[in-house]
Amino acid sequence: GIFIPVLNEYCLNRLAEGHSPKEIVEQFFEEYKDGENEQEQMDFLFKVIQYIERQVVLVDALEDAAYSKLNNLSGKGSLSEFMIRMERAGNLNELMNRLQVFSIRPVLTAHPTQFYPGRVLAIITDLTDAIQANDLTAIRMYLKQLGKTPLFQKTKPTPYDEAINLIWYLQNVFYQSAGDITAEMRRSLPNWDGTLNLINLGFWPGGDRDGNPFVRLDTTLQVAGRLRDVLLQCYYQDLRRLRRRISFSGVYEELMDIEKMVLKCIRHQEKWDFVKFHSALHKVLSDLYEQHDGIFVELVLELLDRVALFGSHFASIDIRQDRREIKRAFDALAQQLGVDEPETPGELFALQAAWDGTLTGDDRIDDTLRSFRVIREIQAKNVPKGAHRY
């Protein structure tokens, strides 16, 4: 660690003098670590990079832990301040009307090779909590764990692995934060009926053939299934927390039944029925109002906010393909069906030919053609929002 500031200062000075990076490194070893062989020099540089990487992780955890202290979460520009401003101006009804046709769509697109692997993300989360609690013993242990944990995988991740890494953000960041935003809006807006579609999450990994040519149909289906399973796990955890508070006779048993239903679906022992799940939660809400003076209804409403946001799909898989590949596929299909290329829109819409599923023998073409059909398969399990953009 003591050589890092020395190396940093040395590099800055030599770069200012016009030396090349290769010259700078060679001169540094001559002046400060003379006598080391090439392998020892490589080991030293590797440890420098390793040390700096972990410093960056520590800074990330520190920033997360101190965010609420460094930023006024209720100040100017925040959602709560905006809603107060709307209320004071008497514009809540107008805002409600505008939100009927307004939605934002955050799309997770970046390849997770740019992010930390899941085990490092878990350490950052625990380290952040320990810093917030000022638990020095835990901080020290997590830093030791971080020092022994590789930050990058030695083997290239599969498209499914990449999707799993990004799903971590859905599960641990977006599920909570998007739900909190919706709950804040619900508490502030008049005549809220739970149907506003304020936030729609998009998801490219597993469906993006343009960005990752190794994506195939089985990957798309796997990712869609994983999105649904992880979402059900989030619902299950929320239900367990609900049951700790809502311990009243009758309603407690209702929550137990819902929890068992979700758990069976997670284990693939029972088919997921969103309508049944949604209705059961509303029954719990109604019983709390009618039989228990509305105690803890806010907790149920917060879960219903998330159910309205994420449904059965969590995020919509965007099926993407290079337009040239799509043209190749349709040219091959037209040739297979014996259809001439339409010259006018009228001729195009008048076509009655239908693909019977016969494959061409070209993997890319067949995958492109079958990707249109897989959308319906995903929609049948994850509702239409599960995959509705090509």
Short names for language-model regions:
Residues 375-383:
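Acidic (Asp/Glu)-rich catalytic clusters
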